A protein has these predicted regions:
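Primarily extracytoplasmic/secreted proteins
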Residues: 1-220
Length: 220
């Protein structure tokens, strides 16, 4: 196996004001392409789908976090079209509150592996995820209070984007470039106080990663 190659990202915290929001994402060129998007918004509205370059993305999960009045979701697309394309998020009605968006490209990936989702627990919220050799983990967290850290694995603070959706969101945290050994990996999320969620997704590597093809840049 080989670890997936991290590519381009977009972070946004807009207020759509309509029943969709769209932006341009530049998918990196290379074998084993993968595009993911992490979303959080008020649970007054629902996601009705995402598409990239006109191709429908697969919904991994959508969760109504009633205690936080938020709806969190994860969509992905294997072998997406490369280059600059429109990523569109559709809603069941106009959205008048800010939403949290994080999209990321990969190459050299066999797609999505295991995932785990745990609602608000007293900080720190520590959970495990069983992964394959050379996988990466992405994590997101939501709280009434500020997100302090997202640790992948526990003890290793990872950078993340901070968004305000009328709740506090930490999104886009990802493992270091070296990936993980196969087994159970501990992921910790913390907030300044109170409760915090812990959602995590495995990004598979590949046994035939193309580490030389196309345009990409590394996001540490």
């Amino acid at each position: 196996m080989a670890v997936a190659i991290k590519g381009n990202t977009v972070n946004a915290n807009p207020t759509p004001g309509k029943n969709f929001y769209q932006f341009t994402h530049n998918q990196n060129t290379g074998a084993g392409g993968l595009l993911i998007i992490q979303l959080t918004m008020s649970n007054a509205r629902s996601y009705t789908g995402c598409n990239y370059g006109g191709v429908s993305m697969t919904q991994l999960y959508t969760i109504n976090r009633g205690g936080l009045s938020q709806r969190m979701a994860f969509y992905y697309l294997v072998d997406p079209p490369t280059g600059n394309n429109t990523l569109r998020i559709n809603f069941n009605n106009s959205v008048w509150n800010p939403i949290s968006i994080h999209s990321r490209s990969f190459t050299g990936s066999d797609g999505i592996g295991n995932d785990g989702k745990v609602g608000g627990q007293s900080t720190p919220n520590t959970q495990s995820l069983t992964v394959s050799q050379d996988s990466l983990i992405m994590a997101t967290a939501c709280s009434i209070n500020a997100i302090s850290t997202i640790q992948i694995p526990q003890g290793s603070n990872r950078t993340f984007a901070t968004h305000n959706t009328n709740r506090q969101v930490g999104t886009g945290a990802i493992s270091s470039n070296s990936g993980h050994n196969a087994g159970s990996i501990s992921v910790r999320t913390t907030s300044t106080f109170g409760s915090v969620t812990n959602d995590r997704v495995e990004i598979l590597g590949t046994s035939s990663a193309d580490t030389t093809g196309g345009d990409f840049f590394m996001i540490m």
